[in-house]
């Protein structure tokens, strides 16, 4: 019997390791989606820079999270013999890999907001600080119970802050960090003339659409695999993700009046919003959550660019920041059993946790980017921006003229 139990335990550990490894690879692939979404949106003279930022940011994120960030979040260090950290078929290692892909999404989100005028090396420095310290602080508070906030919310309001796959922990955090960076950078040259918005058309709708589709497919790994074990897998998460994606698509199509940029960001808005409550909501609630997010993105992107003069190139603040906030709140609404959900959530806890995420992101964003701006500078020179980051930073364009 002991041998049988040992064999069963080994099978469980190996299956869970494979499961979360597949999830990590799927979310890793989403970074290609971030890259092509940005490549398709920016002007051609900044496409190489977009690709280079996403890959470089991921590399820096890995180092920052491996050596510092993961320890801050979960108190786990890998500075031990390989025989120790490879226990249970290396489940702890692939869990780190999976959560790393979440952490690395933060600078990938920011990259889209600061595109076309941010300096390359200072952004890598910002990535290191954000992934090593700011993101892990809030991640640990929510997903590891650090500092006792979750226990206090549970005792005071009957439920802790619920964010199953990161509407607030990942997306709102990235979006509000990006807002701080965008405000400190200022708009691109020529974006506003005499107070009026000047249109900068996307360089490639096909690349933009490709990026959107890669993100959509990978998102099912992002959400479903957030269970982190086979025993915790729920088909409800998959279907809710699907319904929110569809709701966001249809809403953006209607409100955006057939604009392909809005259309291909609509499903992403829905998926951002459903992350928090995808394991709790009824599919109809998920559809409503996604639809509201899709419309919210279109309205707020238009207002931010035209009325508020916030030159957020990919609209990452409305897409991730505002839709992430909506996702945290929506979980407290549509996750209630009275709304067809599984229950076990408190709207007050959701509001407190979401607000804390926004505050941490804004304070951290202004601290990091403000310090770098003061000490080293954030922005390309006027001449560098005019010629584009491809030639100014990387000395090569996206397309050869030969």
What spans do the regions from the language model cover?
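Hydrophobic alpha-helical transmembrane bundles of multi-pass membrane proteins
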Residues: 1-402
């Amino acid at each position: 019997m002991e041998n049988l139990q040992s064999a069963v335990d080994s099978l469980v550990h190996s299956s869970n390791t494979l499961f979360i490894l597949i999830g990590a690879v799927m979310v890793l692939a989403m970074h290609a989606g971030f890259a092509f979404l940005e490549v398709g949106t920016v002007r051609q003279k900044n496409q190489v820079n977009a690709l280079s930022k996403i890959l470089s940011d991921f590399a820096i994120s890995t180092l920052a999270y491996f050596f510092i960030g993961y320890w801050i979040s979960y108190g786990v260090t890998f500075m031990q013999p390989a025989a120790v950290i490879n226990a249970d078929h290396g489940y702890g290692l692939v869990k780190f890999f999976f959560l790393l892909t979440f952490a690395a999404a933060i600078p990938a989100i920011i990259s889209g907001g600061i595109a076309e005028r941010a300096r390359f090396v200072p952004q890598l420095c910002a990535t290191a600080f954000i992934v090593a310290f700011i993101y892990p602080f809030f991640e640990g508070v929510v997903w590891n119970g650090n500092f006792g906030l979750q226990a206090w919310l549970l005792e005071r309001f009957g439920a802790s802050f619920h964010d199953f796959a990161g509407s607030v922990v990942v997306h709102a955090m990235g979006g509000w960090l990006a807002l701080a960076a965008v405000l400190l950078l200022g708009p691109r040259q020529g974006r506003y003339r005499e107070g009026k918005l000047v249109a900068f058309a996307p360089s490639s709708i096909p690349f933009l659409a490709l990026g959107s589709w890669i993100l959509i497919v990978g998102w099912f790994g992002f959400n479903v695999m957030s269970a982190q074990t086979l025993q915790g897998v729920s088909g409800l998460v998959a279907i809710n993700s699907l319904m929110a994606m569809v709701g966001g698509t249809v809403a953006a199509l209607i409100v955006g009046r057939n604009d392909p940029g809005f259309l291909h960001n609509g499903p992403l808005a829905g998926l951002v919003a459903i992350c928090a409550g995808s394991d709790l909501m009824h599919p109809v609630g998920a559809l409503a959550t996604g639809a509201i997010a899709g419309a919210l993105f279109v309205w707020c992107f238009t207002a931010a660019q035209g009325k508020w003069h916030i030159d957020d190139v990919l609209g990452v603040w409305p897409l991730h920041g505002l839709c992430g906030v909506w996702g945290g709140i929506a979980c407290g609404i549509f996750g209630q059993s009275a709304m067809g959900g599984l229950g076990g959530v408190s709207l007050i806890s959701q509001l407190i946790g979401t607000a804390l995420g926004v505050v941490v992101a804004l304070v951290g964003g202004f601290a990091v980017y403000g310090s770098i701006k003061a000490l080293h500078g954030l922005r390309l020179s006027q001449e560098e921006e005019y010629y584009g980051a491809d030639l100014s930073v990387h000395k090569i364009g996206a397309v050869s003229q030969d």
